Curated annotation (Swiss-Prot):
Similarity annotation: Belongs to the SfsA family.
Residues forming coiled coils: none
Annotated source species: Shewanella sp. (strain MR-4)
Full protein name: Sugar fermentation stimulation protein homolog
GO molecular function per UniProt: DNA binding
UniProt-listed HAMAP family: SfsA
Disulfide-bonded cysteines: none
Length: 234
């Protein structure tokens, strides 16, 4: 995924009201960005460090600028836009980068499924094999060298695990795919210290036949894309 037009830099001042962030531009001007991340963004906020943002020409938007990337004090980069994860996975699937998920004839997005009024992020289908239901999660929380998901209690994430278990019980292929949008994360684990119920459900899901994958992103101010798999430690 190439950032076009090119992203612009600024210095983070603060994030507030969940969906807003103030940044200072190189000329000293302060602007407000839309923050496209519903999580706590735990360990992802570094006031004074560089952020990169995109700009929309849609006159109906209240905030024209969207926060895309965050630099870390150690020189790493974080993909702030959690909504990019699905598009990154679709791009990687089309290029055959996710080797565990090749050989399907069609790809659909946001298809209704399950018993709890859910929509699957990605559905892969083929006449020769069972349908493959893929839930995509963006992982950005880094603590003590380990990547974790979720970064806050996630009832929605718990629901999606139950839905995947149900799909697996029906004979479909069910996959949980972590998209690691943090260049310093090299493995992913359930955040039992944050959401113990999610961690327990993940273990049950694996025993029920749900596959769990994680892929790291290569990130720069020019582009972001899925690059290689990394371990999931349960």
């Amino acid at each position: 995924m190439h950032f076009s037009p090119a992203l612009k830099p600024g210095k983070l001042l603060k994030r507030y009201k969940r969906f807003l962030a103030d940044v200072q531009l190189e000329d000293g001007t302060e602007i407000t960005l839309h923050c496209p991340n519903t999580g706590s963004m735990r360990n992802c906020l570094f006031p004074g460090e560089t952020v990169w943002f995109s700009t929309s020409n849609n006159p109906k938007r209240k905030y024209a600028h969207t926060w895309e990337l965050m630099a870390t004090p150690t020189g790493g980069l974080i993909g702030i836009h959690s909504g990019n994860a699905n598009a990154l996975v679709e791009e990687a699937l089309n290029k055959g980068i996710i080797t565990e998920l090749t050989g399907y004839d069609s790809l659909s997005r946001e298809v209704k499924y399950g018993d709890e009024n859910s929509r699957i992020d990605i559905l892969l289908e083929s006449a020769q094999k069972p349908a493959c239901y893929i839930e995509v999660k963006s992982c950005t929380l880094l603590e003590d060298g380990q990547g974790y998901f979720p970064d806050a209690v996630s009832l929605r994430g718990q629901k999606h695990l139950r839905e995947l278990m149900h799909m697996a019980s029906l004979g479909h292929r069910a996959v949980l795919l972590f998209v690691v949008q943090h260049t310093d994360i090299h493995s992913v684990a359930p955040a039992a210290h944050i959401d113990p119920e999610y961690a327990n459900l993940l273990k049950k899901a694996i025993l029920s036949g749900v596959e769990v994958l994680a892929y790291r992103c290569e990130i720069s101010p020019d582009e972001i894309h899925l690059a290689q798999s990394c371990p999931v430690r349960v």
